[in-house]
Amino acid sequence: MRKLLIALASATALLATSAAAQEKIKIGAAPYGLNAEFMQIWTAALQDHPAVKSGEVELTVFDGRYDALVQQDQFKTMITQKYNAIIFAPIDVDAGAAAVQSAVDAGIPVIGSNTRVNSDQLTSYVGSDDTVSGYLEAKSVLDKIGCKGNVVIIEGPVGQSAQIQRLEGNKKALAECPDVKVLEDQTANWSRAEAQTLMENWLTAHPNQINGIIGQNDEMALGAIEAVKAAGLDVKSFAIAGIDGVTDALRAVKAGEMTSILQDARAQAQGALDLAIFNARKGDYKPESDIWTTYKDMPWNGGKDKTYNVPWTPVTAENVDQLLSTRK
C-alpha cells in the first residue's frame, strides 16, 4: 500500500510538472510607438514567432505612442496583470529606467530590444549598435559630396538612445571632413511628415546651399526627398542617407535617390522574444526562432549573454531586390 501511495504521489508530481511546463505564458511587448513601418515590421515578427503561432505564448503588443509616461502606465498594467516577461523598446533612454525597475521589483524579467535604456536591470538586450549606423550613413553622404560642402541633419526623438548614438556616429564621420559645414540640425521625431516640413523650411532658408541630407532614419530621409521634389529640385543632385531599410527606402535606393542601412527588425524582435520565454521558463526553453542560425556572429550562448548585437546590412544595388522580395 505504501509503495502504491508513493507511486501515485510521484505520478501526480510528474503531471503537475508537465502541466506547468506546458502552461501558456503571458508576454508583453512595449515598443515606443507603432506609427512607422519599422516598428510595424518588428511587431509582425513577434506575432510570427513559432511560440506565438503555436499558442505557447500569449503575446500583447502595446503602443507607446512615443510618450514615456504612456510606457510607464503600460508597465503598471503588465505588472498588475502579472505578465511573465516584458520586451521593452523605450522612447527615452533615461525615463524608461523607472519602468524597468518597477517590473524587476515585481519579479518580472525585462528584455530590451531595438532601443536602449540607462538601466543595469535588463535581463538581456537584443539590438544593433546605433553609433555604427550613424557613422556609416553620414560617411555615405560625405563620400558622395567629396568631403566638402554643406549638410543638414534630421534627428530622431531627443533623448532616445538611437538619436543619441546615431548623432555620435554622425559627428564621428563629420570630424573626418572638417571642410563640411552643418547648416541645420533638428529633430523630426522619426516622422516623414515632420521631416518634409523641416526640409521645406531649410531649402527656403538656404537656397542652393545644401549638398547632403543625413536622416537618422529612413522615414525622415524620405520626407526630405519629398520636400526636394516638391521644390522642383533634382533629388539625385543631393546626397541623402537614412537608416532602417523600410520598403519605400528600398525603392528609393533602387531608384538611386538615397542610401540606407538595413536594421533587422525581425532579428531584434524574435531574439528578444526567445530570451523573454527563456527567462519566463526559468531557463527551461530552447530558442525557436531561426535568427540564431542566420547570424553566426550572434550565438545564443545558452541565453546567458547580457547583450546580443544584431549586425547592420548596407542596402546595395546587389541586395535591394532580394530585400524587397521579403516585403509583402
Task: Show the residue positions of the predicted features.
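Short beta-strand elements at the ligand-binding edges of bilobed clamshell
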Residues: V61-D63, V117-S140, I153-P157, D185, ...
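Hydrophobic alpha-helical
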Residues: K76, I86-V104, N170, E184, ...
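Sec/Tat signal peptide C-region and signal peptidase I cleavage site
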Residues: L15-A21
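Extracytoplasmic "Venus flytrap"
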Residues: I25-H49, K53, T60-K76, Y83, ...
